[in-house]
Amino acid sequence: MSPQTETKASVGFKAGVKDYRLTYYTPEYETQDTDILAAFRVSPQPGVPPEEAGAAVAAESSTGTWTSVWTDGLTNLDRYKGRCYNIEPVAGEENQYICYVAYPLDLFEEGSVTNMFTSIVGNVFGFKALRALRLEDLRIPVAYVKTFQGPPHGIQVERDKLNKYGRPLLGCTIKPKLGLSAKNYGRACYECLRGGLDFTKDDENVNSQPFMRWRDRFLFCAEAIYKSQAETGEIKGHYLNATAGTCEEMIKRAVFARELGVPIVMHDYLTGGFTANTSLSQYCRDNGLLLHIHVAMHAVIDRQKNHGMHFRVLAKALRLSGGDHIHSGTVVGKLEGERDITLGFVDLLRDDYTEKDRCRGIFFTQSWVSTPGVLPVASGGIHVWHMPALTEIFGDDSVLQFGGGTLGHPWGNAPGAVANRVALEACVQARNEGRDLAREGNTIIREAAKWSPELAAACEVWKEIKFEFPAMDTI
């Protein structure tokens, strides 16, 4: 063997495959304030020890690969590697473990949710040694939080822009979601807004289809906003969906919305992508637009209990990427959402600081420092009988969005909006008077219906409508 090709053990590199746990399982590690911490629910393949599975997650989502490579000697792996520092079995589940992994901050580009997720929830989710893998929670260190702009404006600035305080905001998604012409769509918006709603909304499917091009929709909705504002004396808005096939087209639509003088635009942030969302959020901050975020596609990622990513992680990512509203489930409506878990990530959206609380699924204490809060949006299968529960569960800093619960009113859109506004005002007044909304909710609605024929009609239509299915995702 020639000197040029000879290898020596003393060089420090030995080819071959070694157990991940020898390098990446470090139970003695003390986490740093600057580490990104992740809690993974790991289901190893039969015969794979949990320590090896947890170490494999840490390795494959940071510096590791399947074999030893000589270029490991050209860097400081102890500085850059992820570390599985704790493993605990999941109570009541066989062969499932919560594996805690710490990532040094230098692994991630500043201000990039895209880069963070590419590492933490990248190829490792297809790793054969694991039957399933789910990211349950992240702790984003303050040092990394400060590299993001966050929401364009936040809760307090939005209230100041709208001049609306002391109650949840009311919205409505226009139905049918597809097929209306732009003029009829604008008419539906106008009827809802003049009836007492604060917002109407494009459905997530509405972009720029042959039956209704985006520019026509924007124009007719702007007309509805200004006409209803003139009649009611209240500031109104419509979530104009700027989501498009390219970032350039998305920004063009947002620019047109700004030129029309409307207060808010909308983005489907998962189908549109985090890079596009962050760009739109920064444009909205610079140009005074509020940004409503829809979560279409989230259930593909978060619905399964043992694989994917929990919605609380998506919510944290959105607060970093930027959005003033985000759909968060209803607890009482037609969409998935267990109460304690939902309130856990609602607090993560709104509060500056959230303590670790495993009873609500919060694995880490999280500080958002000066990052503005995000309004949770309760939407999906809700109607006037749900109003007391929604007011009690979500409080004032929320948006309650009734699509079918407005447009399905037997007398039309405007009476449907009146019914929802009367029900909301009655619940807020009762709460402020010290009444128990959880116990007296139905009585409060019936009392208000005596003075509002619109509410009485709504109560009759939806008196037996319930969505009582168990949540799939529980603690």
Swiss-Prot record:
Co-factor: note: Binds 1 Mg(2+) ion per subunit.
Modified how: The disulfide bond which can form in the large chain dimeric partners within the hexadecamer appears to be associated with oxidative stress and protein turnover.
Binding locations of Mg(2+): K201, D203, E204
Modified residues (N6,N6,N6-trimethyllysine): K14
Highest taxon in the source lineage: Eukaryota
NCBIfam families linked to this entry: PRK04208.1
Protein name: Ribulose bisphosphate carboxylase large chain
Residue numbers binding substrate: N123, T173, K177, H327, S379
